[in-house]
Amino acid sequence: MFINIFLFLFAATINISSSLRYAGFSSYIYTPNKYINNNVMDRKFIRRLNAVDESIKNNEHIIKLTDNAKNKIKQLVTEIEDKNLILKLCVENGGCKGLKYKLNPIKKEDIETDDYIQQFDELKFILSIDSTSVIYIYNNILDYSNDLINGGFKFINPNATKKCGCGKSFNV
């Protein structure tokens, strides 16, 4: 009887935690290797949350682009049929340091209602940022490199406390 109750409570806990994660709460509750017991947030993380809120209120850009990134985006816009390029940017678990960037082209109807939209009118380019990823992406710089090894879009993240050698994975 005790084992059945334990298994039921364990299964219910898993369902609740996965539904919280799906709803987007996991990024604010837990970041790998950052919080101590009982998910106590440290001061740096709370200051970063406040800075993100201020930037959003002031309509400031969450992410900045280098000239190389702007030139590549201009090239991509001229190559596609739809004259508005939309890229979805999010951070997900993975990589050797715990978190990794994901940047994919999407259609306008795929933008979610809680995404943060950053529009670059001069480039005819829209960046749709996943709401749970904003805290990790805030103040990043998007760069582009034509290098044969590790070429492509790269993120310069001043918030990262750890980075892997290839630059694809980070932790805050």
UniProtKB/Swiss-Prot annotation:
Record function comment: Participates in the sulfur mobilization (SUF) pathway for iron-sulfur (Fe-S) cluster biogenesis. Involved in the pre-assembly of [4Fe-4S] clusters and their transfer to target proteins.
Alphabetized Pfam families for the sequence: Fe-S_biosyn
UniProt cross-references to InterPro entries, sorted A to Z: FeS_biogenesis (IPR000361), FeS_cluster_insertion (IPR016092), FeS_cluster_insertion_CS (IPR017870), HesB-like_dom_sf (IPR035903), ISCA_plant_cyanobact (IPR031108)
PROSITE patterns recorded: HESB
Summary of the knockout phenotype: Dispensable. Disruption does not affect the establishment and progression of erythrocytic infection, parasite development in the mosquito vector and pre-erythrocytic growth.
Associated pathway: Cofactor biosynthesis; iron-sulfur cluster biosynthesis
Organism: Plasmodium berghei (strain Anka)
GO molecular function terms attached to this record: 4 iron, 4 sulfur cluster binding; metal ion binding; protein-macromolecule adaptor activity
Keywords, ordered alphabetically: 4Fe-4S, Apicoplast, Iron, Iron-sulfur, Metal-binding, Plastid, Signal
Signal peptide interval: 1-19
Name listed for the protein in its UniProt record: Iron-sulfur cluster assembly protein SufA
Self-association state and partner proteins as the record states: Homodimer.
GO biological process: iron-sulfur cluster assembly
Any one of the GO CC terms: chloroplast stroma
NCBIfam families reported in the protein's UniProt record: iron-sulfur cluster assembly accessory protein (TIGR00049)
Family of the protein in this entry: Belongs to the HesB/IscA family.
